[in-house]
């Protein structure tokens, strides 16, 4: 219902990590889900994820499959982007295989793992998923419940063409802080 939807606006654009962290801090529920501006949730997403958690109480995070649209056309993700469930830390190392818009997670994870790293201008999600996947299994609902739209001029990955530099920065931080 509209009565439970609240909006927050930052004084200034400090990037996706700061925006998500604001939402996490302001959230009142025990389950947190994200929706990026260029993605779309399909009907039933939240219900399916809450059902997953009821059936699998050992999980504190799960994601759904996704449909990719690039420049207005449906495309198939490459094999390296294939999603997996369970203990997926090793699959998370080479690239980001968890999508913020596909995830629902228990707020307890943020209390234990921390929030999105606001010092990273990109790959802040990769950084968080690595920290989570090193300690928790990530569930997978094999039905697509989100559409990811890409190929548009203001897509974040176009702003930072050398994304690997931020993944390396995240890995260096994780190693130096003995997170693993």
Protein language model annotation of sequence segments:
Residues 28, 42-43, 106:
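GHKL-family ATP-binding catalytic core of two-component histidine kinases
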Residues 1-9:
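Acidic donor-binding segment of Leloir-type glycosyltransferases
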Residues 177-180:
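Flexible helix-coil transition and linker loops at the boundaries of alpha-helical arrays
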Residues 44-76:
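Conserved donor NDP-sugar-binding/catalytic core segment of glycosyltransferases
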Residues 10-27, 48:
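Glycine-rich, basic loop-to-helix element that forms the pyrophosphate-binding segment
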Residues 17, 25, 81-170:
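Conserved nucleotide-sugar donor-binding catalytic segment
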Residues 32:
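Short aromatic/hydrophobic "clamp" motif used to bind/position activated sugar donors
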Residues 36-40, 65:
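The conserved acidic donor/metal-binding loop of glycosyltransferases
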